[in-house]
Amino acid sequence: FGALAHESHADLHNWYEQQRDYYRKMIFELYEGFKEVEPDFIVSRPEASIYFVIDVRKVAKPGFDGVEFASWCAEHGAVSLDDGKEYTLLMAPLNGFYSGKKGEDNPGRTQLRVSFCENPDLLRLAPELLSKLFRAYEAQR
């Protein structure tokens, strides 16, 4: 934070505005993309974070577990897109973000976090990737 002490308030304000504008556009495009390919996914609209929370509870078969799905995507999940290349999507399951009593349903079980920490051209593939990976996973489960 010491380096920021030498920056003017106006320069910091301009930098923050640039960041907001950059992410605002990306958030809008990705949100619309997720809703277009999977209208029944519950998709957050981030305000202060650089990730989406996507809940698949309305479309997942009973017993869906985000940890197992995220692991499957990392280890086995690969889908081809129109360019002929195979891709996967790395996500963070949200099971561990909630506390509760043993035996209670964990709302994070069907929730996944998709980060914006990727180049925008690849990030634009996320809605189609998640849809295809989710459908492939559910078909084999």
Q: Residue locations for each model-derived region?
A:
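PLP-dependent class I/II
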Residues: F1-R141
